[in-house]
Amino acid sequence: MDRKLKVGVLGATGMVGQRVLSLLENHPWYEVVVVAASPNSAGKRYEDAVGGRWKMTTPMPKAYKDLIVMNVNDVDAVAKEVDFVFSAVDMTKDEIKAIEEAYAKTETPVVSNNSAHRWTKDVPMVVPEINPEHFAIIESQKKRLGTKRGFIAVKPNCSIQSYAPVLNAWKEFEPEEVVVTTYQAISGAGKTFKDWPEMEGNIIPFIGGEEEKSEKEPLRIWGHIEGDEIVPATSPKITCQCVRVPVLNGHTAAVFVRFKNKPSKEELIKKLVEYKGEPQELNLPSAPKQFIQYLTEDNRPQVSLDVDFENGMGVSVGRLREDTIYDYKFIGLSHNTLRGAAGGALLCAEYLTAKNFIQAK
């Protein structure tokens, strides 16, 4: 790489946009040159546009404070300045679909944190350690969009990161039925306790749309490319309940699994700790050295002890044991705004850069 790639962050003032910017500070491959947000923020210094709404636990990086926020709707103006963009915009689904396609059509690759395009037939939805081969569908997408280098790639929902990688590590034993309950942090809703005081000491047994995503998205990730589309897998059957809990960061999952070929507990643990994907082989800057860790203590994984494993990019598993109804049960934990959101998108971008899908304009 002759120079760092120039990056724009769309939706830069929101919580996920802030997290993306924090991760891009001092990145070896990328340099943020554009922060874009709603017309209300456009024209202001980034620090002024965010005001008192900086939600990260680390200070706002100095390099971004004086950047003048561009209007996210000025697609051509933003596209002229950047090699690619991260999308974390807060709009309706149809608006997100339209604006991400508009950027792609200016020959600007879009790596999206949003759900709008997750079921667009030729848009890859990727966890780089699980299904990087789905990025091959980008060639079909470019034909549809009429582009040479512009495309959209997305990362999946934050809720599935605590169990989909685990089940993927056990694929050869053919999981057939999976029952999941997720316990999801408030940052998944873009909130802190300051914004959402009624969550303190409270549990809300419903998160809109989350259960459907948690049941269906893993099947698309385990699907295959057929012609110009990604065809989802048909198994395992997954049923899920999603609960909002009074935790700032970290989604926990309690999971029950039935296998076609029941393995031993030792075999399952071995598969977890030995699991490596292409990001590890390629030594991508944001890739965890160890993707999944297995903890033997009865009281692990815990959010307060384990959520930052591998800088929030690893998955922690514990309490694997045989079950009285299913074959096995376990607890999984992942960082919802790192592995589950901004970090997952950044890892996708790094993989796409390493494989020359994203290049300097």
For the regions a language model picked out, list residue spans one by one.
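N-terminal Rossmann-like NAD(P) cofactor-binding subdomain of oxidoreductases
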Residues: 1-205, 237, 309, 316, ...
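Charged docking surfaces used in two-component/phosphorelay signaling
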Residues: 187-361
